[in-house]
């Protein structure tokens, strides 16, 4: 009896041990399954997040591209730059462009340098209240109705044009036209914001004592501080007259004072608007001596 009882105890212990091991295995597998599920869930969530991020990035890029693409679409009845240039002188024109700089305002008339992605438009003495003039910060989009005209080679929209402010903004990048100086292609960039690099300052005239000077007040030296500055620069043996238009950049500006400090022989880089007067006569807004 003792032997059987002991045998029975041994058998029961083995069964209990086996049952305990089986339960441990089940729990272990369950835990492992949960862990794998967690990893799978985390991987799925990460993939979903990454996909969402990529989708958002793609959408943002698409939106930006669309904005750039439609930024210069013309409204109904508005000319493209090509159509504007092809229009006859003294004909009515309607254009949309972006203010790049304001030259002056006086007695409800504003003179503006404007540009779109295709070309530039000089607007002379447009009808403009002082209140509206203050709104015409660089980049402002305007729709202009007026008459195309030409004055001493400068194609412009004549005095009396009207405009309305529209939604949109654009600042034109500077275009280096140094290599186009002296070529027939230069005029195709008329009124655009441009750069000239590596030019040499030449004598602009002489002072009262007969000494060569690097600039003149007014084209003939008849002016004084605060008037337009005229100076000559050369490239490849050709000399050109550039101007600091005092209405655009007065005698408190960096460029005005930079030109007053030029020395004959200086090498300079410049930026400004490609104005025309009996030939190229840029209105310079920046001068850097190298």
Located regions from the model:
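OB-fold single-stranded nucleic acid-binding module
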Residues: 68-290
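Repetitive helical segments and hydrophobic/amphipathic motifs
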Residues: 23-24
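Short, Lys/Arg-enriched N-terminal segments with co-localized hydrophobic residues
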Residues: 1-11
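C-terminal motif of bacterial Sec signal peptides marking the signal peptidase cleavage site
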Residues: 28-31
